[in-house]
Design a protein with these regions (language model features):
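NAD(P)H-binding glycine-rich loop region in Rossmannoid oxidoreductase-like domains
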Residues: 35-92, 96, 100-103, 201
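Conserved Rossmann-fold NAD(P)-dependent oxidoreductase catalytic core, especially the SDR/UDP-sugar
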Residues: 81, 95-139, 153
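Conserved beta-strand positions in the Rossmann-like core of class I SAM-dependent methyltransferases
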Residues: 4, 28, 159
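Conserved SDR Rossmann-fold cofactor-binding beta-strand/turn motif
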Residues: 31, 113, 162-165
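Active-site-lining helix/loop region of Rossmann-like oxidoreductase modules
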Residues: 79, 139-141, 150, 167-221
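N-terminal Rossmann NAD(P)H-binding glycine-rich loop of SDR-like oxidoreductase domains
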Residues: 3-23
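Conserved beta-loop-beta element that borders a ligand/cofactor-binding pocket
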Residues: 148-169
Length: 221
């Protein structure tokens, strides 16, 4: 499988890059011009901004699917930390994908979203609900909701992955669809990456367009 990957230098994207390579897939990574990135062997790197339609089209040429692991960045972990990205970054990325992918002959995209986005807020406990709307976290969540709406209005074969609280650590193989997101719900980034690779590789179109992804032993906090 040939996969175009955006956000390959990020926390999730770097794990997906590893998964793709280890499973023998061909990867084209679209990387910002100023980003420090030493590509692993057999990874094709194209330098360009994610909002540059020309760069995106070049990266998508000849691909079978797209893995989108971009997201709004903040200066710190606090909800009110300053934004380092445009407040509508993912909305604009989605619009570009909807425009560019059909012309490149690519239908499938698996995009990183977040637990608590859109209607999944009803699956969240009180603290998570508060955090999802607080400060610039709320800005990012509203942007992701609009990203999903843009994809939903398209004819793409798309899936938005909504992980619960992300943690580091080696893969456990326990990532899967959950129906609640509580204070103590966690999922490892490496497990999310492995699950997303499985989604990218599915032989049939997606039936569900969103999935709340957690650890299958996660409880309700």
């Amino acid at each position: 499988m040939k996969v175009a990957l955006t956000g390959a230098t990020g926390f999730i994207g770097s794990h997906i890059l590893t998964e793709l390579r280890e499973h023998g897939h061909e990867v084209t990574a679209l990387v910002r011009p100023g980003a420090t990135f030493v590509p692993p062997p057999n990874v094709r790197v194209m330098r360009g901004e994610p909002l540059d339609a020309t760069a995106l089209a070049a990266a998508l040429n000849g691909q079978d699917a797209v893995g989108c692991c971009l997201g709004i960045r903040r200066a710190g972990k606090a909800p009110w930390s300053a934004l380092l990205s445009p407040p509508d970054l993912m909305t604009r990325v989605a619009r570009l994908l909807v425009s560019v992918m059909p012309r490149a002959g690519v239908r499938r995209v698996v995009a990183m979203s977040a637990g608590g986005v859109a209607e999944s807020i009803t699956q969240c406990g009180g603290v998570i609900r508060w955090m999802a709307g607080a400060g610039n976290v709320g800005v990012a969540y509203r942007d992701l909701a609009e990203m999903e709406r843009q994809l939903s209005a398209s004819r793409l074969d798309w899936l938005a992955v909504r992980p619960v609280t992300l943690m580091n650590g080696p893969p456990t193989g326990l990532a899967g669809k959950v129906d609640r997101y509580g204070l103590f719900s966690i999922v490892r980034r490496s497990d999310v990456a492995a699950w997303m690779l499985g989604a990218l590789s599915r032989p049939t179109p997606f039936v569900e367009q969103t999935v709340l992804l957690g650890t299958l032993t996660t409880g309700w906090g």
